[in-house]
Amino acid sequence: MAFSRLWRNNHLPFVGIMILLAAALCLMFYALLWKAGNLADLPSLRIGFYNFCLWKEDMGSLACYNFPELDVLGIPQVGLALARLGVYGALVLTVFVPLPLLLAQYNRDEGEWRLAVCFLAASSILLAGGLSLFLSFVWKWLRLSFLGPALPALCLAQLLLIFLLVATVRFPPRDKEDKNQWENC
């Protein structure tokens, strides 16, 4: 009985959406801030959104490259900047999703709900675009076995963002229901 009341009042889907949102945020914080965006972090290779270090045999250590050298290696400055903007912009927009969702749930305001949907859609597009753009530039130095836990975390966050977008569209806030339904007869 209590379970059906929670479902009918739209509380259970809302709690599920908020839990999934917290999980997506944790995964993005882990990959982009804790792991510093490094998709490959090995003793002989470090490739991330802000690090590009390859092993130099003659030096016997990692040599990190910046933009004049990165252009020679085939990584354009504008492309890398757009990839960074995409993934870190997705994190920033996702941070702002819970507040409009909370306000939409408790005020039953459709405008705030639409704002949360727009933030989720933009975050999903930015994360997918930034990650695919970055991987297209650095894939010739990466192998599947080189990848660390940051890439699966970002891919799982992308899946959660898509699922959140679908769930948020599927379960919009409902209008306030009258407590006394006998008066409507």
Curated annotation (Swiss-Prot):
Give compartment(s).
Answer: Membrane
Listed GO CC annotations: membrane
Coiled-coil zones: none
Residues on the membrane's Cytoplasmic side span 1-13, 106-114, 167-185
Domain of life of the organism in this record? Answer: Eukaryota
- Kindly report the protein's main subcellular placement as a broad class: membrane
Q: Name one Pfam family in it.
A: TM140
Query: What keywords tag this UniProt record?
Result: Membrane, Transmembrane, Transmembrane helix
Residue ranges, Extracellular compartment?
A: 35-84, 136-145
Q: Which residues cross the membrane?
A: 14-34, 85-105, 115-135, 146-166
Q: Which PANTHER family match?
A: TRANSMEMBRANE PROTEIN 140
Return the protein name: Transmembrane protein 140
Native organism is Mus musculus
